[in-house]
A protein has these predicted regions:
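Extended, non-transmembrane interaction/recognition domains
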Residues: 76-125, 166
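Class I S-adenosyl-L-methionine
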Residues: 118-171, 175-177, 227-333
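Alpha-helix capping and helix-coil boundary motifs
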Residues: 42-49, 100, 148-156, 181, ...
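Long amphipathic alpha-helical segments that form oligomerization/scaffold cores
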Residues: 204-205, 209-243
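Short N-terminal helix-initiation segments at or just after the protein's N-terminus
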Residues: 2-11, 99-111, 262-263
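Extended, well-ordered alpha-helical scaffold/bundle regions in very large, multi-domain proteins
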Residues: 174-220, 313-326
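Amphipathic alpha-helical scaffolding segments
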Residues: 80-93, 159-162, 177-195, 209-212, ...
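Nucleic acid-processing catalytic cores of prokaryotic defense/repair systems
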Residues: 1-96
Length: 333
């Protein structure tokens, strides 16, 4: 079942044609090593290559992928940050057929030696992943937004995280079959074309109240009795800065980063970690890598051993990434 889920993700979410797995002698689940995209019978434009790379970088499923065309086979580092000024992300050294055969053979992936080779040590790094880059960028946005708005840091943080969640829902919904939230919700209730339009028209707090009611939870809530001071400060503050960050209208190197992210492919576990990461004053990123979380969940909740009655407690819960991953496993069961 773990292979089936991996294949489904590769095909439906990323459009990959094949997946190469690494198998283990013990009871560990097979791990996807790379995705393969077959373009031997169809044209591949530069725009399509950039789209594939953007999605792969955001998705954090495998560190390397291959694109096969009629006259070439190219290997790509899925951890390399997208750059819209570049046409191709394939390493030049890899284009040389003989060297490619030596460095990118199946056996090196089967035994894991590929990742330990000297030539590969500067590539496929978590430090360059969308996960770390997003959190790093959001820390800069949070600091700037708090300074410009003058809001209390906890109010500014809560507002930013709520806006991030809404943006996440909006962009994921754009690719769904219904598309209700992205195309209808804002227009129906606030006569706005999208989330950033809601912010610019000064209706953010009204939207949060509506979402708090519709979602039947406290994640979007600003209590009208207990948080009067906070609500007043939000009403009086120039919140449009948030819209500029979210749609990347600030044309400098610091904030256009938002355009790099595809929330249809960014793992939900990343979003779950944002609040805790922004809460700390440290410049370091302490986000737990998804591969570690997956390993622990596989050990505690094997996919091939579904349970009808299962209880789980995370006694040192921080970002909630383990609980999110565990919930996804229960859904898979």
């Amino acid at each position: 079942p773990d292979i089936l889920f991996a294949l489904e993700t590769a095909k439906n979410k990323f459009g990959a044609d094949a997946v190469y797995f690494r198998y283990f002698q013990d009871s560990r689940a097979a791990v996807p090593q790379l995705y393969i995209f077959d373009y031997t019978l169809k044209p591949l434009s530069s725009q399509e290559k950039n789209r594939i790379h953007r999605n792969m970088w955001n998705g954090y499923q495998v560190p390397v992928y291959i694109i096969i065309e009629k006259s070439s086979v190219s290997f790509f580092d899925a951890r390399e940050k997208p750059d819209y000024n570049r046409v191709n992300y394939a390493q030049e050294i890899i284009i040389k057929t003989g060297e490619a055969i030596r460095n990118f053979n199946a056996q090196s992936f089967d035994n894991g030696l590929f990742w330990e080779e000297e030539i590969n040590k500067n590539h496929f790094q978590f430090e360059q992943s969308a996960t770390k880059d997003l959190i790093r960028g959001l820390k800069e946005v949070y600091a700037s937004f708090q300074k410009e708005s003058g809001l209390d840091k906890h109010v500014a943080l809560k507002l930013l995280v709520q806006c991030l969640l809404i943006k996440y829902l909006e962009e994921r919904d754009e690719d769904s079959q219904s598309g209700y939230f992205a195309s209808t919700y804002f227009q129906k209730h606030f006569q706005c074309n999208g989330f950033c339009d809601v912010i610019r028209q000064g209706k953010l707090l009204d939207l949060l109240d509506k979402l708090a009611s519709d979602f039947n939870g406290k994640i979007f809530q600003w209590d009208k009795e207990k948080e009067v001071k906070e609500r007043t400060s939000i009403r009086k503050t120039e919140i449009k800065y948030l819209a500029n960050y979210l749609d990347a209208n600030i044309e400098n190197n610091q904030y256009v980063f938002w355009r790099l992210y595809s929330f249809s492919h960014l793992p939900v576990e990343v979003i779950s970690s944002v609040y805790e990461e922004l809460l700390t004053d440290s410049k370091d990123i302490v986000y737990t890598p998804e591969m570690i979380v997956s390993t622990l969940v596989d050990e505690c909740m094997p996919l091939q051993s579904p349970q009808k009655d299962f209880k789980l407690i995370d006694v040192s819960c921080g970002s909630g990434i383990f609980l999110v991953k565990a919930y996804k496993r229960i859904v898979q069961w």
